[in-house]
Structure formats: structure tokens, C-alpha cells
Amino acid sequence: MKKSLFLLVFALLLSGCSLLPSAPTPPTTMQLTNSKISVLTPSPEITNTITPIPMAEKITATIHTSEGDMIVNLFPDKAPNTVANFVGLAKGTKDWTDPKTGQKVSGKPLYSNVIFHRVIEDFMIQGGDPLGTGTGGPGYKFADEQVDEKYLRGTIAMANSGANTNGSQFFIVHRDYPLPNLYTIFGRIDASDTASLAVLDKIATTSTAPGDKPIKDMVIKSIDIVEE
């Protein structure tokens, strides 16, 4: 009788174990309006307020990549905080936190030698993550800016994981795309700049592995900023 009771209890315990839920998945998925497209950008722990700084009326960013250069005309009049953040991280004049070490970084450009970690032909190319995985950032976040522009070919905008969670990740639109106004637009490649658009095409059409990561690294070597 005791043996039968023990076996019954043991069987119940085993069946109970099978009902234990699996570990929860961290909420890191960010949708770009299309359910087939998601990028990973966890919410940073530190909230950063971008202090507006005097900027030139015309600012261009030359993104030097392993595939060639793309010249982007920034919009300091329409998205001053976002442009100030991008320029500071590109030049190394803005402090950020290295997600690999947790250490504060000063005087070093964040974008140098960072890859475009997610590429979707006819949609966009995304980069700006120091980890190169889609889960990294500068260790802070800042608010969206409402910009009355469309996501046309060559447009550069901030990636985010929800409202007011901008950091360092950005994307460049490959083809005109009907996105809602949820991602701060802060610049664009000139439609007549065929050389820059050819580089965009080359990166956007590269072969990718599952998860939309290029098989061959598409590297941002550095970003030069010119203010006029």
C-alpha cells in the first residue's frame, strides 16, 4: 500500500513538472509596422536629455562604409536633438556607455567600425549598434521629434523600441516605404546623388542569413561631419 501511494505521488510530481512555464522572453522586439520586420533594441536603463547646441544651417554626414561612401544631408532645423545626438556620436564629442563592458566612453566615435546588422532589400538597412546584434546602444535614450517628412528612398531615421526610446541605432530607407510617423527622420541622401544611392543599393541587396544579417559584414568605417 505504501509503495503504491509513493508511486502515485511520484507520478503526480512528474506530471506537475511538465506544466512549468518556460523562462519569459525579454521584451526586445521592435516592429517597423510590418509584422515580418522586427529589430531588437532593448530599452536602455539610463534616460538622457539631449541638450540643444548651436548648429550650422547645413550639415552633411559622409558615411564611409566597406562598400563606398554615402553622403547624407541632415535636418538640424527639423530634428535638432536627433541631429545633435548623431553628430556627437559620429565625431566622438558625446559620451556613451560601451554595452560590452558597461564602461563610459569619452572622445571616441561610437559609429566607427560598426556594422549594418540588419538588411532588408526594398525596405531598409540598419546599423548603429556597438554590439552588431541589434540589442546594443549608447546606454541612454531620448525623446522622439515630430518631423513632417516621408520615408523616401535614402531617408535616414532613428530605430527605436517604442515611443521616446531613441539611442544610437538608425536605418536608411532603400525604397520609398509607407511607414507611419513613429521613427524620427533626421536626414536624407539627395535624390540626384547617384554615387551614394549606388552604395545604398549595394548594401541593401547583399546576401543575408536568417535574421536579415548580411553574410559579409557591411561595415561603417567612420562618419565625417561637415558643418557650413
What function would you assign to each model-found segment?
Residues M1-P24:
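Sec-dependent N-terminal signal peptides of Gram-positive bacterial secreted proteins and lipoproteins
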